[in-house]
Structure formats: structure tokens, C-alpha cells
Swiss-Prot record:
This is Metabotropic glycine receptor. Highly expressed in brain. Expressed in several brain regions including the cerebral cortex, hippocampus, cerebellum and caudate putamen. Only expressed in neurons, and not in microglia, oligodendrocytes or astrocytes. Expressed in the visual center of the cerebral cortex. Also expressed in the eye, including photoreceptors, ganglion cells and trabecular meshwork. The keyword Glycoprotein applies. CDD domains: 7tmC_GPR158-like (cd15293). The gene is Gpr158. Residues 1-24 form the signal peptide.
Amino acid sequence: MGAMAYSLLFCLLLAHLGLGEVGASLDPPGRPDSPRERTPRGKQHGQQLPRASAPDPSIPWSRSTDGTILAQKLAEEVPVDVASYLYTGDFHQLKRANCSGRYELAGLPGKSPSLASSHPSLHGALDTLTHATNFLNMMLQSNKSREQTVQDDLQWYQALVRSLLEGEPSISRAAITFSTESLSTPAPQVFLQATREESRILLQDLSSSAHHLANATLETEWFHGLRRKWRPHLHRRGSNQGPRGLGHSWRRRDGLGGDRSHVKWSPPYLECENGSYKPGWLVTLSAAFYGLQPNLVPEFRGVMKVDISLQKVDIDQCSSDGWFSGTHKCHLNNSECMPIKGLGFVLGAYQCICKAGFYHPRVFSVNNFQRRGPDHHFSGSTKDVSEETHVCLPCREGCPFCADDRPCFVQEDKYLRLAIISFQALCMLLDFVSMLVVYHFRKAKSIRASGLILLETILFGSLLLYFPVVILYFEPSTFRCILLRWARLLGFATVYGTVTLKLHRVLKVFLSRTAQRIPYMTGGRVMRMLAVIVLVVFWFLVGWTSSMCQNLERDILLVGQGQTSDHLTFNMCLIDRWDYMTAVAEFLFLLWGIYLCYAVRTVPSAFHEPRYMAVAVHNELIITAIFHTIRFVLASRLQPDWMLMLYFAHAHLTVTVTIGLLLIPKFSHSSNNPRDDIATEAYEDELDMGRSGSYLNSSINSAWSEHSLDPEDIRDELKKLYAQLEIYKRKKMITNNPHLQKKRCSKKGLGRSIMRRITEIPETVSRQCSKEDKEGTDHSAAKGTGLVRKNPTESSGNTGRPKEESLKNRVFSLKKSHSTYDHVRDQTVESSSLPMESQEEEATENSTLESLSSKKLTQKLKEDSEAESTESVPLVCKSASAHNLSSEKKPGHPRTSMLQKSLSVIASAKEKTLGLAGKTQTLVMEDRAKSQKPKDRETIRKYSNSDNVETIPNSGHMEEPRKPQKSGIMKQQRVSLPTANPDVSSGITQIKDNFDIGEVCPWEVYDLTPGPMPSEPKAQKHVSIAASEVEQNPASFLKEKSYHKSKATEGLYQANHKSIDKTEVCPWEIHSQSLLEDENRLISKTPVLPGRAREENGSQLYTTNMCAGQYEELPHKVVAPKVENENLNQMGDQEKQTSSSVDIIPGSCNSSNNSHQPLTSRAEVCPWEFEPLEQPNAERSVTLPASSALSANKIPGPQK
């Protein structure tokens, strides 16, 4: 019967627990009460508020959170063994302590769990006690229970106490007291207790010993504390409706009840058993239950309590409520308190963790909790009881985390960085000063050879390339990291884009394999191409910057942290994939530059600028490759000082070296005399190249350096170009000299048509002409040479040798030509000699060219005399660009500068000079033909043949020592010339007295104005890139040898071995001057008959002017040597007696033009030049106008 009652009671208790949980969920504490219950409940709360505000003596915990108070109380009030057990949890020390009663931890700081949320491990026991109390309240408040006695319900109470231990394992003991009279008897009538002993539950009835509960002690506080305040804090869930209504309310679970707040908590305590403390801390939870009187007034009936073991309950000293709450010793300003779980009911189960930016002075102490060992005895001193103060020290500045006082960030070397930035600022200042210096010397040849705008652009880009070092001096930021890419890429594109485009321009202009003019790349065009490159780089940088800004919105930072091998951190600009792409782009661009350097390696240039640019590009490629490799591999481990030095070294090994390679040679050459380089190399200056033909010179050299081309093709191309240059020269001459158009010629239109036909010669005809020159030189050269030299001393025995001379002159003029600009001054001769093989067109062409040449004779002689004083170096073989540079200093002469370095031009000049000599001899022989015998001419011819036979073998002997000088640089020697013949001046005076040239040729008055007196030239160097003397001028050399043989007393043969005389370099120069003097003397002594000039000497007059017209195309200083001049004078005297003027004159004039056809009379071409016979003075002036003008300009010649 008892077992069934226990089981039934347990089932009812479980059911009540379930219904109570449902009721609690349906009626939460915060739900507003009904209007009927609001007033009395307000009174109950009004009565409870003063109690809550007053200190409750039953609560042993203070709200103080000071850990020092806890340590002091533990040292002063708590026994040593108990305190040691509280800190260590070692029960062996507790057994050695003696006791007379239980020990409670009362009056210690902390909050009671009853006033706040308790420990989670106590929630089960608390809920079990609350539901059991509410079950008793409902049982005692029913009608039936009120009629029954306590003895009848004893079994039910025993079953209830037993069920508490079985339902919650944390409860070690449960008890219930019951009294029928609430206040009349101090002790309860029933006292039932159930105890857990190992695996079984012991149920005891202690009603007989319940009288000890009447005494108020610490052990009975759980009963007397609830009895003293018998009015419970409970509320009626239903209205008072009498017994019937109460039963109805029971069925509706209405009535008086309690919750967790009605449970009383005792402080932790130790039980004393047999004079010693029982191991294990306990806490008692108690709650009262009430019944109803007959008048339905609540009355106290009893108390139910449970004892809970705390050995598995952790003390949280870091929390704000609970036992020992807030008693930690962590400094909240630099550390955080973190509880340690699973240690049980012991103190100090926490650790102080240093906050970010702080560290503990002892590296191996991570917290201030130290579990004491079992053999450790609590001494009772404050030092041992209290927990050691956990102090966290701040880290070094800038360190978010640290373990000790060592710096976590890399310490920068301030002095090193200051020295680097100072030197970098100095270099940037020097770069800016260099821009000003280059602009100041913008008119210098060295600066103009490279281009002022391009040099300034390179220097400006260098400033941008210097900026990354300045940016890295400061702390990295997002803006500085973006600016770093902008400065690097824009500077690289500007500097090396300009250098590469300059090399590209050299490749385009100098390495053209055709003689056709290509579009010239001026500085403006190069800048436009550079603008395209810079625009592409700028567009990429804009896109990259916008993507970086978008990444910042996605929390993708551009600035990160690196760590060195010493575990020191530093801020750095992160490297992304775009940096790799830009490095590859730089590498490919530099490879293109290296290809251009290889392509232009054979191109000569003033100051060797392409060579220095090639060195700069190769240097940039190598240094940049090393720089990017180190940067990409070691960037995250390279500290800022090393990174700054890396950028510094990269900037100066590339940018500074490039600036030095471009500027230092220019200013170093400016102090020396660069004529050697100017003579052998071509300028790259955009100004000169736009006006000169030196680019063709370089293209010819490059073409000859590649032997894959056929010389015949090059010769054909040159012939076409010469014809085009002749037209250009004539147009420019007429444009700059409008007065030349006043003297019109009836054959002018015919001459223009012939010149147009010359320029349109097909390629096949040109090749046929060149082949005929090689195959049929015996016919043309022998005949032309014989006509030239029909004088007693040179005419015989010269038919074979001139053929070889003509062939050599043609070949060497092509091989050794260094500038096609030289031929611009001599296009009249070249263009007239192009169609020589066409026998039918020669007469018409020569007449047209003679008419044009006769108009410009005086004008050319005046310009040649002026050029003699303005050009510092006579016959300097320098590039056309250098001539343009020198000619720009003399803007008053709108003419082409003097050039003479091509051997082909030198050879043609020699032949024209000999033709002029023949013309002069013709005038002399005309007056002496009547008195001369024919046999004398035969005698002189034999003498000439014998002389030439002796000269030819000696020419081979003289050729050998002169071969090493074929392409070398020869120094011009100063040669003194004899003074002018007084007969010439007398002849000129006589001519001026006889007639007034203004009356006959008023358009030539301006041309007869004598030019400035040429100053004596200094001994200067010039370049002669030519073959030996015999190869370039064999006829002149033979004549010179013959003269040396006949005039051995003068000692000129020995002088030629000691030093190179001017007669060897330019043997035609002195000869021309002597011929002009003899011509003037003959003009003054020999009268001209008008009738004879019309009838017999018509062709002779034309020939004389024709030769003079051709002579205007020669440079002013191309004259015959003195030795040959004297020889010609002797031959002229003999020719007066032996030769016939009618037979000699055509040959002498045609020899210079290689022509064999009869010429048109001058009277037919220019009939207005011949006046009636009644004007002898005018007729005389018309006969030799060119000779008169030539004599007038040649009398005040320079003394050399």
C-alpha cells in the first residue's frame, strides 16, 4: 500500500510539474493583471519595495566588486585551512582543520544568485523545489485536505521528499517540515528528510528531534527565516468564490502559489562532522508552503528545503553577479578578465588577457591564476591569499600586438633616408638646370643635332622618373601608392619613348635603300608619335586607378603590411597582377628599342648619338630586369630602407646614366673642334635634314655596306636623282634671283623641254648608257680627250689613257661619294652629261644649257668670291648638314653652300677647267694662225707624244705610296701663290676704257660688283675620302709629272714626298687661276674684228661663252696648279704659229662636255648681243662678257 502511494504521489508530482510549466508559459510574469487584482497587488508590491531597498541580513554577499576587500576578508576572517581549500580545492588540507559547527562564507563580496540569474547547473534543482512547493500549496488549499489530519498524509510527504532526490541528481539532501499551527508552536510536528548516500537514498523521519528547530541558529536559519515572514509573496490566481468556487479554481489551477523569487538561498558552507569539516561546499535552497484557514486566510504550514553540492559549480569572478562576482584583479583599461571553466568551486579561476597594444612583463605568465598543489599550505598572509596583480604594459608605438618590449615595427634609419632624399632633390634640381642650359645653348650644333624639343622632353620625363624615390620617403598610403605608378609609367613612356622614336627616325631616314625622297620625320612628327604612346599609358593609368578605387569600396586595400625575417612588420604598397603586366610591357618596349639600336648600328651620326642611345636602352633593360626581379620576389620581406635604396639605385643607374650619355658628349665635343666628325659623319638634326641631302649620303653608305645590291642599280638611281636636283636648283636660283629673268633667250622654252626630258629618262636607257660607257670608251673618250688637248705639248698620244681615266672617274665617283648634296652645285655639268650617248640630242641640249649658263656667269662668280671669305675651310669634305649649319649663320646669301668631296665632281671639274684652257688658247691662236706654219704643229705633237710616253710609267710609281691615303684624313697645307700679273690689271683697265658695260649689258652691272676680299684662310683640317691621286685625276697627274721632268730645277718633286702640297690635293685650283690671268691678258692685247666674229668665228664665240657658262658651276676654288699654268702658256705661244682656230675651237669646248656634234652659233641663240659693225667697242664687249667679268673678279685674288 505504501509503495503504491509513493508511485501515485510521484506521478501526481510529475503531472503537477508539467501543468505548472504550462501555466507559467501561459501566464508570464510580465503579463498585466486583471482589473480586479491590480489594486491589492499594487499594495503588495508597495509593501515589498521598502524591504527590497533595505539590506537583507540573510544575504551574506555585498555588492562591492573590489577584489582587495575579498583578499583581506579571506586573510582575516576565514580559517587558513578553509581559505586554502577555497583556493586550491584540496580536501586533504580541510581534514586537518577542527570544527564545532558548519562554516559559512558569509559577509564576502559578491551578489547572491537569488537576486540575479543563478548558475546554469543550479537551475534544475531550483525548478524542482519551486514546483514541489507549489504542489503542496495546491494540495493544502483544497477542501479535502483541510478535513484530513497530518498523520494520514505522512506517506504522501515521504513520497514527495524522495521524489525530489530521484528527480534531480544535484540534490544531495531534501527535507520537509509540517506544522498544524502556524504560530502557536515554534517547532514543527513533522520533519521528514531524504539523504543521498552513494547509490541509494536514505529516508528518515526526524519528527522526534524536530524540537531543535525551535532554536534559531545558523543550521536552522532555513526554517526560522521563512517562518518569521509567514505572509507569503504569492498572489491569488482566481476570485474568492467559497468552497465551491475554490474547488472550481483548483480544477482551473487557480489559487496561491510561488516562483523562483520566493526561494531562499543560503551562503556556501562546509558541514562539520565529528569535529572536522566535511569536504565539499554546499548551499541550501528553501521555500515555504501555505494553507488556508476556514475564513480563507493563508497560513504558514511548513518549509521544504534541498541541499545542493557546489563542487562542480564554477566561481565566475569576472561576471557581474553571483558568488564572488567582480572580485578579479584585472585592470580593465589594459586587460580583460576571462573565466576558466571546469575548475569547480575555487577562487582565482580566471585569467587576465592583455588588450590589443599591451603585453605582460613576464612572457611566460599568461594569467595570474596558479593552482596550488596538494602539499601547499595556506600561510594566511595577504600576499599569499591575494591574487597577484596582473599588469599589462603598453607596446611600442604603432604595434597592434606585442609579446615584449621589443619593437614590432621596423625602425627606420632617419639619417640614411635624409641623405638619400637630399641627394635625390639635388639630382632633380640639376635635371631642371640642365633643361635651362640646353635651352640656352639651343643654337649649338650639338644641341640642334639631337633636337631641342626632344632633349627637353627627355629631361622632363627624367624628373618624373626621379619622383618614386621621393614618394617612398614618406609613409605609404593609398594616394601615394597610386601616385607611384603614375610617376613611373608616365616617366618611362616619356623618356624611353622619345629615345626609341629618335632611333626609329634614324632607321627610317638613314637606312632607306632607295634614292627616292621619303617623308621626313621632323621633331613635330616625333612628338605626335610620342603623344600617342603617352596617351595609351595615360588611358591605362586612368582605368587602373578607377579599379583601385572600386576595390577600396570592397575593402580591398592597396596598402598592406610586410614582415621581415626578424618578424618586424612594416607598411608597404601591395603588388597586384597589374604590376606584373606593366613590367612585361616595359620589357617588350625596350626590346623594340634594342632592335632599333641593332638596325642603326652602321649609321654614322654627329657626336655618336645613336651609339649613346643604344647604350642607354641596353642599360635600362638590364637594370630594370634586375630591379623588377628583386621587387617582386623580396618585396614582402624587404624593409622600407632597403626598398628606398633599391629605388634610388635603380633611378640613378638608369635615368642619370641616360641623361649623362645624351648630354655629356654634346658639351664635351663643343669644347673641341668637331670638324673631323662633321666631315665623316652625317647630322641627324631635323632642321638640316629637312633642307639637305645628307640622308641620301648615309643611305648610299649603308647600301654599299650591304654588298647584296648591284652598283648598276645604285648608279641608275643616282642619275635620276641628279636630274631632279638640277631642276630643283634652277627653280630655286630663279626664285632667289629674279633679275636673271630679264635676259630672255629664244631657246629658253626649248631648254626647259630638254631638261624635262632628261628627268624622264627611263631606267633602261640609263643602264644602256652605263654599259656603253664601259664597252665603247675608246671611241668617246679618245675623241673627246684629243679635242681637249690639241696643243703642241699634250695633244698627241693621249687617246688610250683618257679612256681609262674616264672609266675610273665614273667608278670612283660612285664608290667614294659621301654626300649627294655636293652634286647640287654641279648639276649643270652632270645633267648635261647624262644623255651623252644620244648623238642626235647633244647639239640642242648644249645650246640650251649654254644660254642658261651665260646668264648666270657673273652672278656665280660673285657668289663664289663671297663664299671664299665666308667658308673657313676650303674644300672641306664635310656633310651637308654641317654646311647648312654654317650657312645659317650667313643669311645674307640665299645660295647653296660650297661643297666638294665627291671624286666624281672633282674629276668633272678638272675636265671643265681643261676645257676653259682650250677656250683661252683658241683666242690666242686665232690671231697668230696666219703667221704660223703647219709643220710646227706636227713637231709639237711629236714632242707631246714623247713626253706622255715617259709620264705613263712613272704614274704607277707614284700611285703606290699614296694608296694608304685613299680614305684617310689629310691636312691641308698652306700654299703661297704668285702675285697677279700686272699685264692682267692693265688689260682690265684698257677694257674699261674702251667700252661701258652698262650700255651693252645693263642687267650685268649688279653682277660685276666685286665681292669682298677673301681673307687668308688658316691651315685647317679637311677630309678627303677618295682614291689615290692617280685614280681620281690621272690626266692632271700626268701633266704634273711631265712638268716636273722638264722643270726639275724647281724642286717640286722632292716637296711632294715631304708634305702633301695643295697642288696634289687640288691641282686644278692654281691652273684655273693662271688660265684666267692669261685670258685677261689676251683680251686686253688682242682686238676682235666684228666681221670675222660674224663669219668665221661664230662657232668660236659660242664655244667661249659655252665654256664660261659651264665654269660657273665649279666651286670658286677649283683652279689649276701653277705648274700646269706655265706649261699651258708655253703651249699657247707655240699654238699661235701652228694651229688653225677653225679646227681647234670645237674640240676644246666639247671636251668638257664629252660632246662630238657641231654646236649652234651664239648669234642664232642670242642675236641681240651682236651690234652693227659701226660699234667696235660694243662688239668687243659683247664678244667676251663672261671673260671680262671673270677677270674683274679674279684680279684681287687671295695670297695663299
